[in-house]
Amino acid sequence: GQIVAAGDLQALASLGENPPAGARVRALAVAGAFHTSFMQPAVEPLRNLAATLSTHPVSINVISNKDGEVVSDGAEVLTRIVNQIANPVRWDLCMETMKSLGVTGVIELPPAGTLVGLLKRAASEIEGFALRSADDLPAAREFAERHL
């Protein structure tokens, strides 16, 4: 499995210098501390914006990154998206849900590659497609048609 640590740079450097036994620590190329408590100040403004939006019943089930649960209510999907920015992504639970639902293919949107790589290792029975640019759209369409 993979665990992502977030914190101030000095604390993360210390973790890198003294990793837990058997662990490998490396810095991730990210634009921000998304899905961590460092994003908490953004939750309320996003919640206020979300309150101005209308939701509708979803036409397909959504698997929540919070806990891998299937969500079918549009308002709940929006609430979970707002809260997700300051909470960990549980991709492991999402993959378990996809396996239990019989999902056969997943398209990862840009920037793509990380989740498909994890999928390949943890749920090899599910085929992954990393959509990296507009040039990949025809192949992504063919991929989707094979998995409908």
Predicted regions and their residues:
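Acyl-group transfer acyltransferase/transacylase scaffold of fatty acid/polyketide systems
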Residues: 1-148
